[in-house]
């Protein structure tokens, strides 16, 4: 492997490299969360349904799921600086034209463009730090990049709400542009080019099949409330998703550098950890999708107020994550993960029992408890998954963690939106009534009932995650 980063790099240059990567990580984290607060506003602006507007989130996740590992390997082959800088520029283009969108279709397409750039940034940023910084600084630097992502993830809802209330929803896209251009400039001017001379096979068929499997399944679920179980469109799309999945499993079993290393699932510790992560990520993403609609359209909070409310769990997670890691070292992952999942289930139960007169404290408490549960689950679960595989497979296991979390999140959003829409339609509301924020206020009990029922159903999946965590064991299974 030939690395220009093997030469001694001045400390000032190292700091600027780290700054560029931290900018990228912050933007990726911020962009994921800022749009959640805008969902009710976007639904009203475009006079569309929340089942349509959910695709602004789903398309972003689907593109990242399909491309992030591939972009990392392309960076190894063609140069990490090149792909990282290009990622910033593509992200700028997606942000600029996304803010100009006049239809939901345009917005969804430009979110996909953002995700294309985001996959290049996310896949190559930490590799650039690892290659270019000296070993004695590497751990701290990687910790800072992780902190940068979580800072963006934390401030995203509050910043997004403030921008929507003050200057309009389009600025949640425009705000990315100056920072992305700064990151691109630093990347191109400061970061040395690094690549490998080794031959690396890129699993393009696997990436494409993974995208098709998830995309077709989510599209089938999205169509279900409108066309029904027996409609040819639903049956055809679902069948194509299953066929794509079968081809994916076949391809991944044979390729030398698969996106999904299926042999790792022979470990009960690994497979139970992945299964519980998929379920918990799905329920949490689903609630993050539904909660802004509940708070804005039913309880009358402004976007900026909603942004500050849903930040609560992220603050708790940042505080609790180091504590959870220490507790995991002392008590083991099974106890911490099972307890964390159970706490999440309790928090979701109390969210489902909220009513139209719920006070701010009554809303915040379940979110705080939810953050505690997620923190107790997440770090120990990741540690146990990585500990269940041999050292040479740790990179593949880390990729599987990221892919699972995003796939679970996308599935959770799709299923919750479908169920919520189905319950409203079953209550006699037409599509135009469901789309209108005024209808939420004229028939609040109907929407409140659908919200509560959807959360209760999601909680069923959380309880299954509790069971997976409880049976995982503590040591890798041979």
Residue ranges and their predicted role:
Residues 147, 151-167, 219, 407-429:
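A gly/Pro-rich, aromatic-decorated transmembrane alpha-helix motif that marks the paired
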Residues 2-189, 320-324, 331-335, 339-345, ...:
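Transmembrane-helix bundle of Major Facilitator Superfamily
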């Amino acid at each position: 492997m030939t690395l220009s980063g093997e030469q001694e790099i001045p400390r000032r240059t190292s700091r600027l490299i780290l700054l560029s990567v931290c900018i990228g990580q912050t933007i990726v984290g911020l962009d994921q969360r800022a749009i959640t607060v805008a969902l009710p506003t976007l639904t009203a602006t475009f006079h569309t349904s929340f089942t349509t507007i959910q695709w602004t989130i789903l398309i972003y996740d689907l593109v990242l799921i399909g491309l992030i590992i591939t972009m990392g390997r392309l960076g190894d082959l063609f140069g990490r600086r090149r792909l990282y800088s290009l990622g910033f520029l593509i992200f700028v283009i997606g942000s600029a034209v996304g803010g100009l969108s006049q239809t939901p279709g345009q917005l969804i397409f430009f979110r996909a463009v953002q995700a294309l750039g985001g996959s290049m940034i996310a896949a190559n940023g930490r590799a650039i730090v690892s290659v270019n910084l000296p070993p004695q600084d590497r751990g701290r630097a990687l910790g800072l990049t992780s902190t940068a992502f979580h800072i963006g993830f934390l401030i995203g809802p509050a910043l997004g709400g403030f921008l929507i209330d003050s200057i309009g929803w389009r600025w949640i896209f425009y705000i990315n542009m100056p920072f992305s251009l700064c990151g691109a400039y630093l990347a191109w001017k400061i970061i040395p080019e690094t690549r490998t001379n080794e031959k690396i096979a890129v699993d393009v068929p696997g990436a494409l099949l993974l995208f098709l499997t998830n995309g077709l399944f989510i599209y089938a679920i999205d169509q279900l409330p409108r066309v029904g179980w027996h409609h040819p469109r639903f049956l055809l799309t679902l069948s194509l998703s299953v066929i794509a999945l079968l081809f994916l499993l076949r391809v991944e079993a044979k390729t030398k550098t698969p996106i999904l290393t299926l042999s790792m699932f022979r470990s009960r510790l690994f497979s139970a950890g992945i299964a519980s992560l998929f379920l918990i990520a799905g329920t949490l993403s689903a609630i993050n999708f539904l909660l802004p609609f509940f708070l804005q359209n039913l309880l009358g909070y402004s976007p900026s107020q909603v942004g500050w409310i849903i930040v609560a769990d992220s603050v708790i997670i940042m505080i609790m994550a180091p504590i959870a890691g220490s507790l995991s070292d002392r008590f083991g992952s099974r106890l911490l993960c099972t307890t964390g999942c159970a706490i999440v289930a309790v928090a979701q139960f109390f969210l489902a029992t909220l009513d139209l007169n719920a006070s701010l404290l009554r809303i915040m408490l379940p979110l705080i408890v939810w953050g505690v549960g997620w923190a107790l689950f997440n770090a120990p679960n990741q540690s146990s998954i990585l500990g269940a595989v041999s050292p040479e497979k740790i990179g593949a296991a880390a990729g599987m963690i990221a892919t699972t979390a995003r796939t679970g999140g996308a599935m959770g959003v799709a299923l919750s939106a479908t169920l919520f829409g189905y319950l409203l339609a079953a209550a006699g509301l037409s599509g135009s009534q469901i789309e209108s924020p005024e209808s939420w206020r004229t028939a609040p009990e109907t929407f409140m009932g659908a919200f509560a029922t959807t959360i209760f159903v999601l909680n069923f999946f959380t309880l299954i995650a509790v069971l997976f965590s409880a049976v995982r064991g503590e040591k890798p299974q041979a």
